Amino acid sequence: MRMNPTTSGSGVSTLEKKNLGRIVQIIGPVLDVSFPSGKMPNIYNALVVQGRDTVGQAINVTCEVQQLLGNNRVRAVAMSATDGLMRGMEVIDTGAPLSVPVGGATLGRIFNVLGEPVDELGPVDTRTTSPIHRSAPAFIQLDTKLSIFETGIKVVDLLAPYRRGGKIGLFGGAGVGKTVLIMELINNIAKAHGGVSVFGGVGERTREGNDLYMEMKESGVINEENIAESKVALVYGQMNEPPGARMRVGLTALTMAEYFRDVNEQDVLLFIDNIFRFVQAGSEVSALLGRMPSAVGYQPTLSTEMGTLQERITSTKEGSITSIQAVYVPADDLTDPAPATTFAHLDATTVLSRGLAAKGIYPAVDPLDSTSTMLQPRIVGEEHYKIAQRVKQTLQRYKELQDIIAILGLDELSEEDRLTVARARKIERFLSQPFFVAEVFTGSPGKYVGLAETIRGFQLILSGELDGLPEQAFYLVGNIDEATAKAMNLEMESNLKK
């Protein structure tokens, strides 16, 4: 760990001025810089252009070396807009890769790709920094034990459990509850696992980033009174930024998460929204650097770039990084190289359904479309596996019968099918759950449901012990005891009305 060479401070300027170059060409966000013979910077070194533009405005642009061109020239990609840069301007080689602040000082704050705070809450302690380019942990450091990462969310833990140190794809359109689900996971990991979260906003809308920040402050995930008690650090490289920033912002977020895992020995949740934008930015940079495009116009290094990022997300003997990545599927084509490359790395998928959201069932996780490699008897145990399979079979049968019900009505079904439908409707409602972060909007207190409680609840519904209870008793409750208590209250209310 060392001082970030790109941040200004006492004693840094003398270090910076050791190796100077000059801009010889500018094409959009790409700069060609010439250096004296024998003083070429290394690949991935950070270069800083400082000076004034034609109207006297100060310029401070950081770039990253991508190619050594020969003739003492390097090609670098800018991390911010290149407006005002001119040929002949002085370029400082910092002699090291981009480094960003890490540790407790990052919690509750918003950073850009360079690790500079952008929330106007004052400077951040930069005594502890870490370079954004690091190799993945060695095999000997990895924790190979397969273990479930309990989220306290019934539908996730039962039907598509997350792996500790795994990677989860989050699929869902606008307005189906993705943000609320993300905030609930951040809240639950802090309370149940004593962990922290890092949110990487990669190439998404600035408005969404701002909304997320405001909602986090409202729900207490970011503590405004005591910022150090916040549970999340935010790193944004949004749509309006140059491709260099969007390509590297994921690595900045990952570097912050790695420190919490390796040094603080914590369980960390890393959110990347959206992993497709990371690939898209890489494609833009690749074209600007003059590389021959591959299939569908993507960069030839697509698999390598994705692998470099994903392999750093893992469990070690110190702690774990569990990553949840929102995946945009262009034109709903799952065979597109970007989502297809992402799928190769995922351990589980959580699919959010607009149909369930329309019914008011939140979290709107589709129980039949969501999958997990962890749902195997040898990992989750025989009982969990059997109940998960029976829940899926019941819901699948209900789905098959829906056309018949719509045309002929429930009365035309056999006794067995009617029972299946009744249980499926109870299961569907019991998969909903009140969230802690939604208390502000709904007024009902949030519930964390342990895995054992979840299994017991669905076991009771499937066994038929609760067939006599009304289905609305299962809607938006925590464990099964709350459902039976709610049923008694409903019965008392109906008796009073009589």
Curated annotation (Swiss-Prot):
Its main location: plastid. ATP binds at G172, G173, A174, G175, V176, G177, K178, T179. PROSITE patterns: ATPASE_ALPHA_BETA (PS00152). It catalyses: ATP + H2O + 4 H(+)(in) = ADP + phosphate + 5 H(+)(out). SUPFAM superfamilies: C-terminal domain of alpha and beta subunits of F1 ATP synthase, N-terminal domain of alpha and beta subunits of F1 ATP synthase, P-loop containing nucleoside triphosphate hydrolases. The keyword Isomerase does not apply. Pfam families: ATP-synt_ab, ATP-synt_ab_N, ATP-synt_VA_C. Its EC number is 7.1.2.2. It is found in: Plastid, Chloroplast thylakoid membrane. The keyword tRNA processing does not apply. Gene3D superfamilies: 2.40.10.170, Bovine Mitochondrial F1-atpase, Atp Synthase Beta Chain, Chain D, domain 3, P-loop containing nucleotide triphosphate hydrolases. GO terms for biological process: proton motive force-driven mitochondrial ATP synthesis. It is a peripheral membrane protein. GO terms for cellular component: chloroplast thylakoid membrane; mitochondrion; proton-transporting ATP synthase complex. GO terms for molecular function: ATP binding; ATP hydrolysis activity; proton-transporting ATP synthase activity, rotational mechanism. It is an enzyme of class 7 (translocase). InterPro entries: AAA+_ATPase (IPR003593), ATP-synt_VA_C (IPR055190), ATP_synth_F1_bsu (IPR005722), ATPase_a/bsu_AS (IPR020003), ATPase_alpha/beta_chains (IPR050053), ATPase_F1/V1/A1_a/bsu_N (IPR004100), ATPase_F1/V1/A1_a/bsu_N_sf (IPR036121), ATPase_F1/V1/A1_a/bsu_nucl-bd (IPR000194). Keywords: ATP synthesis, ATP-binding, CF(1), Chloroplast, Hydrogen ion transport, Ion transport, Membrane, Nucleotide-binding, Plastid, Thylakoid, Translocase, Transport. F-type ATPases have 2 components, CF(1) - the catalytic core - and CF(0) - the membrane proton channel. CF(1) has five subunits: alpha(3), beta(3), gamma(1), delta(1), epsilon(1). CF(0) has four main subunits: a(1), b(1), b'(1) and c(9-12). Produces ATP from ADP in the presence of a proton gradient across the membrane. The catalytic sites are hosted primarily by the beta subunits. Belongs to the ATPase alpha/beta chains family. This is ATP synthase subunit beta, chloroplastic. It comes from Jasminum nudiflorum. The gene is atpB.
